[in-house]
Amino acid sequence: TYKHTPIILGGIEASLRRMAHYDYWENKVKHSILIDSGADLISYGMGEHSILEIAEALQSGIPVQEITYVAGTVFKSHDISRVYDPVVLPSFEQVQTDKKAYADSFAIQYRNTDPFTAKPLAESYGNRGYVIQNPPSQPLTQMEMDDVYDLPYTGRYHPMYQKEGGIPALKEIKFSLTSNRGCFGSCNFCALTFHQGRILQTRSPVSYTHLRA
């Protein structure tokens, strides 16, 4: 029934697995989640801009396979000749077997988290083609940040978790407030820069006075 429905991944899980990556649970280097899942696109990082552009493209009749130009997305292709000035990462076969190649690949990715200087990145999967990462989306303006956090979030977990007793960790963050995004640090234990980028984005002080009950 849904054979021709575009499948687009997002969120931190897909974002941090957008290229070849080490999986702690399986203790091995795995493919980009775009390869393993069979999805059409990844909207990585903070996706407010990219998901709107994807939706507008689909609404206008552009096939999902041709949506290869949106900042903040990852797509698959057998041809990188039409990608402007890409940086070719070590192939999956290389990073799977060579620790230095893995480190080199991650270092290149880390240096391309700034939307103003980042280049497209291409990772080869042999006869499966390439996984190509476009530069990150532009950061949100303060007004956009205010609008995002003024939405009517419920602060509740999905009902599917009720039979398991809920999500205990939610108690720690349920009443926390998001004041900013991004981090210019490079802490090796933290994925914040890799997910949200280096550019700090902040809410206005007045936005906190409009908090919903």
Model-derived regions: residue spans:
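Glycine-rich, aromatic-lined ligand/substrate-binding cores of catalytic
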Residues: 139-144, 148-152, 167-170
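Conserved small/polar residues in nucleotide/adenosyl-binding loops
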Residues: 209-213
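Catalytic cores of nucleotide-enabled group-transfer and carboxylate-activating enzymes in metabolic
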Residues: 26-31, 35, 43-44, 135, ...
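Iron-sulfur (Fe-S) cluster-binding segments and ferredoxin-like electron-carrier domains
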Residues: 190-203
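Glycine-rich beta-alpha loop elements in corrinoid/cobalamin-binding modules
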Residues: 1-126, 133-134
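N-terminal pre-triad scaffold of radical SAM enzymes
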Residues: 164-191
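Short, glycine-/Ser/Thr-/acidic-enriched flexible segments
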Residues: 14, 48-49, 153-155, 182-185, ...
